Structures are given as structure tokens and as C-alpha cells.
Amino acid sequence: MKVGVIAYQGSFEEHAIQLKRAMSKLNLTGEVIAVKKPKDVDLIDGVVIPGGESTTIGIIAEKLGVLDEIKAKINAGLPVLGTCAGAIMLAKDVSDAKVGKKSQPLIGTMDIQVVRNYYGRQRESFETDLDFRVIGGGKARVVFIRAPIIKRTWNDATALISFENGIVMAEQKNMLATTFHPELSESTIVHEYFLSKIKK
């Protein structure tokens, strides 16, 4: 199993560590690959789009030709986990809590509406416990950093976990989106669940 993590900016190392921990817990043999060029996408069985600045990630990925390559692979069934900025990249509908609709390069494969910077400056970063029973876990502490929120889902996209009147984890076929940072959690449940989607 080869899992790619888009590695232009954001928490590549943290995701790599969590993926390796999750592989170990699930007794899976695999490696984590930094995805920077279109050819890297051909090597992987699943991809993580990490947190960071979604506009920057999108612009770099578009310029290097990775954006279209990943979009085509996701549409063909490649499992993907988008976290925070990665969830924004996956969304078909994106707006900003302050400035409304925002134009930026997106992958745009998931039937979710995401609002950037949802929690505002008062709560730029915070931690809370979420219940992961729906994906086979228990309660786990998670970190939100200038987090977006998933306002709604449609078609066969479904809300998995909600918090404070918004969706913080959603799923649609081979796509998984979280508005928190599972790579900064002690728990590996989100990465384990993602790896189980690759294994199928």
C-alpha cells in the first residue's frame, strides 16, 4: 500500500507519522509518499490533502499539473482524505465567513458546501472532544485551527460527525473530509478509517 500526502505546505510530516501509526495498528504494510509532481500521483493507492492555506495549495498544484491529475484519479475512485484546507479543496461549493463566495483553484469533487474561517478570530484555534463511534472509534481530542465548517451535503455525501451546528466530518464514496486536524490528535481513528477505504 502506498499513500500519498500532498507536500507543498501544511502538515505533511504529521500526516505521515499518523498514517504509519495507523498502518501499524491495522497490521498493514505500506509507505507514505510526498506528492509534488503529476508522476507521483501514479504511484499511490490513496491521497491525503493536508491542512495549510487552501488557496496557496490550489495555485501550486494547478501550476504543476497535479490538481487535474488528482481530480481525475479521485473521479476514477482513488480514496482521498482532505483535512481543513484539504476539505475546502474537495468541496464543490466554497465561501468565506467574511467575504462570501471565493474564487480559488479547487479539486471540487465532493458534494459539500464549505465555509472558510467559520469560527472567526475569537476562536482561531481550539481543542474539543468528538465522538468517533460512527467510524468505529470512541471519544478523541481534536484540534481546530482557523477551521472551516461543512454547512451542507447533497446527493450521496453524508455527514459523519457534527459539532456546534455544523458538520466537521463528511464522506462520499471514496472521499473523506474533516474540518479539524486529525494528524494533530493522539488518536489515529480517522487515518485508520481512511486506510480501511484504501484496503477495500
Curated annotation (Swiss-Prot):
Task: Please list the reactions this protein catalyses.
Answer: aldehydo-D-ribose 5-phosphate + D-glyceraldehyde 3-phosphate + L-glutamine = pyridoxal 5'-phosphate + L-glutamate + phosphate + 3 H2O + H(+); L-glutamine + H2O = L-glutamate + NH4(+)
| Entry-linked PROSITE patterns | PDXT_SNO_1 (PS01236), PDXT_SNO_2 (PS51130)
Query: Where in the sequence is the active site?
Result: C84 (nucleophile), H181 (charge relay system), E183 (charge relay system)
Q: Which residues bind L-glutamine?
A: G52, E53, S54, R116, I145, R146
Record-linked Pfam families: SNO (PF01174)
GO molecular function annotation = glutaminase activity; pyridoxal 5'-phosphate synthase (glutamine hydrolysing) activity
Please name the SUPFAM superfamilies in this protein's record: Class I glutamine amidotransferase-like
Q: Does the keyword Hydrolase apply?
A: yes
Cross-referenced NCBIfam families: PLP_synth_Pdx2
Q: Read off the HAMAP family from this record.
A: PdxT
PANTHER family in the cross-refs: PYRIDOXAL 5'-PHOSPHATE SYNTHASE SUBUNIT SNO, PYRIDOXAL 5'-PHOSPHATE SYNTHASE SUBUNIT SNO1-RELATED
For this entry, the protein name equals Pyridoxal 5'-phosphate synthase subunit PdxT
**Organism of this sequence:** Sulfolobus acidocaldarius (strain ATCC 33909 / DSM 639 / JCM 8929 / NBRC 15157 / NCIMB 11770)
